[in-house]
């Protein structure tokens, strides 16, 4: 049960993406993302900022990169590296400004290490992340059709 409780499944327009969440690295972030998932917050939200060779960002209800859930999170920076498949929290200049937006790295992004909260890693479906349409902003963006915790699907 513990493994599925920390397994996030994103049904995207490009196919399913499974992220193993890491409460050992970022307990506050993982708990908040689970809350948002269970509230249906991420359902229908677009990948609004997608930079080739870098990352795909989602989690803004307006699709503008300016919105969120309204609940800021205290930074939980850790030593986990930003590499291909890393799931990390987006934020503004203030380290404690993470909210609902997160990104998945397409490739190594070590320049982010220790400055953004890593909270998980893609374990299945990275090929679907690779297919997400690029752009800033993205024209006709891909989206999260439905986000769910594996434990809730059982």
Tell where the protein language model's regions lie, with residue ranges.
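Cyclophilin-like peptidyl-prolyl cis-trans isomerases
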Residues: 1-154
């Amino acid at each position: 049960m513990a493994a599925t409780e920390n397994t996030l499944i994103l049904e995207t327009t490009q196919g399913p993406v499974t992220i193993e969440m890491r409460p050992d690295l970022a307990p506050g972030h993982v708990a908040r993302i689970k809350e948002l998932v269970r509230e249906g917050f991420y359902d229908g939200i677009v990948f609004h900022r997608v930079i080739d060779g870098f990352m795909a960002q989602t989690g803004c209800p307006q699709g503008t990169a300016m919105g969120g859930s309204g609940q800021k999170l205290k930074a939980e920076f850790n030593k986990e590296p930003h590499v291909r498949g890393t799931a990390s929290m987006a934020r503004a200049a203030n380290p404690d400004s993470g909210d609902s937006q997160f990104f998945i790295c397409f490739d190594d992004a070590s320049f982010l290490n220790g400055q953004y909260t890593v909270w998980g890693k893609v374990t299945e479906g990275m090929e679907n992340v690779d297919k997400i349409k690029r752009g800033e902003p993205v024209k006709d963006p891909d989206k999260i059709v439905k986000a769910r915790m594996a434990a809730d699907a059982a």
